[in-house]
Amino acid sequence: MQGDPAGALKIYREARSRYARNKALLYGQIDAQLADGQAQEALKTTTAELQLTPSDPILHGLQARSYAALGKRLQQHRAQAELYALQGQLVAAVQQLELAQKAGDGDFFEHSQVDARLRELKIRQQEEAKQKLPL
């Protein structure tokens, strides 16, 4: 299947019709969509699945790859930040959101969302730093 993304995609779709909630098949389907140049379809799939399971770091990573393939840098960094935040890597998450702020794309609404999430994560960073201080 490595050299045949379209064939792999067909197999994943058939398998998912039988096992719709199987995460491994879902991830494989999205990966095959990206390999087949179907970044917009991959983005639709990740976005729909994230509505159901917003705390899935793998989906956020696949969404970041989808945005990257579409050239949407702000959204790419934002999705990557969510992946890092879910993994507890707050420093990396903050860095990604700072990159998102500097991205030359995105509209006012998207920038506002990035700014708000950046504030949230910085507060969380400060709270965690306070908890680590010796008494």
Task: Set out the residue ranges of the language-model regions.
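Alpha-helical linker/edge segments of TPR/alpha-solenoid repeat scaffolds
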Residues: G37-Q40, A69-A79, F109, R119-L135
